[in-house]
Amino acid sequence: MQIITQKIAPCLWFDSEAEEAAKFYVSVFKNSKINTVGRYPDEGQEIHGKPAGSVMVVDFEIAGQKFVALNGGPQFTFDEAVSFQVYCESQDEVDYFWRRLTEGGKEGPCGWLKDRYGLSWQVVPVALLEMMLDRDASKSARVMAAFMQMKKFDIEALKRAYEGETV
């Protein structure tokens, strides 16, 4: 059995929602699965304080990317300093991920959101990246001005801004 399949895997620290969160993320993204669930043993309870047999770690994959979710307790919470970007090829895809990831969460500016577990995501159209990399600084400036006014990205509105049309 090969345990390590990629060099780096984000470890997400939850209070006690690791398995629930992993199941949610696996339901949102294609090519996703839960690989293993590890449980707390009797040993070490004086340190970890978790009931024996309760979920300790969940090894899972989102869109082929390996993650680990850990039920470590309430000491640490997620913040915006670390987030995950979801690259989308179409408005339908932007809409889907925005809807699913904000279920029980909170919308933010410029494509950012917090999911129901407090994890930060940015749902990003690939077209936006292409427009922002244009050598014509006036085009990318118009796109930036447009997306700074948005929560969920609107690809057609971004394209209109890129072309110099009124948004």
Spans of model-derived segments:
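Vicinal oxygen chelate
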Residues: M1-I3, N35-T36, E61, V68-G72, ...
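Core segments of cupin and vicinal oxygen chelate
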Residues: L12-G64
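Short, solvent-exposed beta-strand edge segments and adjacent coil->beta transition regions
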Residues: T5-A9, D79-S83
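Short coil/turn motifs at beta-sheet boundaries
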Residues: I3, P51-G53, T77-D79
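Short loop/turn microsegments at loop-to-beta-strand junctions
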Residues: A9, V55, G108-C110
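Residues that form or flank phosphate/diphosphate-binding pockets in enzymes
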Residues: E20, D79, D92
